[in-house]
């Protein structure tokens, strides 16, 4: 397999990253004060806040003095997030929302605007995965995957962006995936939906630039995360392609959002794959997929298919 020699420099670089995945979000005192001033008193709406990354992000924003608006289809999980935030002394309000239904998104957004007011930071985090190959995936599940992972972004953003434009400040965060930058067997609907999420963010950022408005965007593309959504998946080289801890991913996301980064891939090694995907022929990329175990990473998928998280 001659193409594997192309991997040797990257393998050498990656071998120097021992302990990288234990990184925590730390900033200097000066920057920390600026961040607190930026977030304190701001209203942050997070979709998929009933578990996983959404819940952890809610805690982190709450620690910085933000007011939280929690959206999730999982009412019980969302109530648990709300309870923990209130125990921390954080002002928060929870709403049960099915993000696959745009009319429900619009209805709940109107309720938020009347009960809470303007949203300053919108975190489009909710997502679902079926983990089924195209011919085995029921039509209704494919439709729901695209509805939650892609279509919902249009309607959440359309509802809360006008307030940001009026005040000439705000931030829209899209939690996408490395599946939005490549294709993976067993994730046809998920990859398509996340490519849509990446395209949504890129086009939105372009529109905001054209308007000369100071509303920021951040798109986040992590690999597999150990939140339950991808239970059962495995890669051949976990040092290079680890199953990431949600705590680590949230640390990276918070740093990116609070420092206004436009694009974040997690882990850093992912940037190499993004570059290679744009340079190498499909035959070579397939060899990489085999070598790293990506091609068959979904073969033993179990997952958690009943929630938006």
From Swiss-Prot:
Region (Required for lipid droplet localization) location: 1-50
Matches recorded under SUPFAM superfamilies: NAD(P)-binding Rossmann-fold domains (SSF51735)
Catalytic residue positions: 190
Function: May play a role in lipid droplet formation. May modulate triglyceride levels.
Similarity remark: Belongs to the short-chain dehydrogenases/reductases (SDR) family.
Keyword terms, alphabetized: Lipid droplet, NAD, Oxidoreductase
Lineage: Eukaryota, Metazoa, Ecdysozoa, Nematoda, Chromadorea
Gene Ontology CC: one annotated term: lipid droplet
Enzyme Commission number(s) of this protein: 1.1.1.1
InterPro entries per record: NAD(P)-bd_dom_sf, Sc_DH/Rdtase_CS, SDR_fam
GO biological processes: response to oxidative stress
Top-level lineage group: Eukaryota
MF terms (GO), sorted A to Z: alcohol dehydrogenase (NAD+) activity; oxidoreductase activity, acting on the CH-OH group of donors, NAD or NADP as acceptor
Disruption phenotype: Viable, but intestinal cells contain lipid droplets that are reduced in size and that contained a reduced amount of triglycerides as compared to wild-type.
Protein name, entry field: Protein dhs-3
Native source organism of the sequence: Caenorhabditis elegans
Transmembrane segments: none
């Amino acid at each position: 397999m001659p193409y594997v020699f192309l991997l040797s420099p990257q393998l050498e670089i990656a071998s120097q990253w021992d302990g990288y995945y234990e990184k925590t979000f730390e900033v200097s005192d000066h920057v920390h004060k600026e961040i607190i001033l930026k977030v304190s008193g701001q209203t942050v709406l997070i979709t998929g806040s009933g578990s996983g990354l959404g819940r952890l992000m809610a805690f982190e924003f709450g620690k910085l003095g933000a007011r939280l608006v929690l959206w999730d289809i999982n009412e019980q999980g969302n109530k648990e997030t709300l309870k923990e935030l209130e125990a921390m002394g954080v002002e928060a309000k929870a709403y049960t929302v099915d993000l696959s239904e745009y009319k429900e998104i619009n209805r709940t957004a109107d309720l938020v605007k009347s009960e809470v007011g303007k949203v300053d930071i919108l975190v489009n985090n909710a997502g679902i995965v079926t983990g089924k190959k195209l011919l085995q995936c029921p039509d209704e599940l494919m439709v729901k995957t695209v509805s939650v992972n892609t279509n919902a972004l249009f309607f959440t953003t359309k509802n809360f962006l006008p307030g940001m434009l009026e005040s000439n400040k705000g931030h829209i965060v899209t939690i996408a995936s490395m599946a939005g930058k490549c294709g993976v067997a067993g994730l046809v609907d998920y990859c398509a939906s996340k490519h849509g999420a990446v395209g949504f963010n890129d086009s939105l950022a372009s529109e905001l630039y054209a308007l000369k408005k100071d509303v920021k965007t951040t798109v986040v593309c992590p690999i597999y995360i150990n939140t339950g959504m991808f239970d059962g998946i495995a890669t051949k080289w976990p040092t290079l392609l680890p199953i990431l801890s949600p705590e680590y991913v949230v640390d990276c996301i918070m740093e990116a959002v609070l420092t206004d980064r436009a694009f974040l891939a997690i882990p850093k090694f992912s940037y190499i794959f993004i570059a290679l995907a744009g340079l190498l022929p499909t035959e070579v990329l397939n060899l990489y997929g085999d070598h790293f175990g990506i091609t068959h990473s979904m073969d033993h998928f179990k997952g958690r298919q009943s929630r938006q998280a």
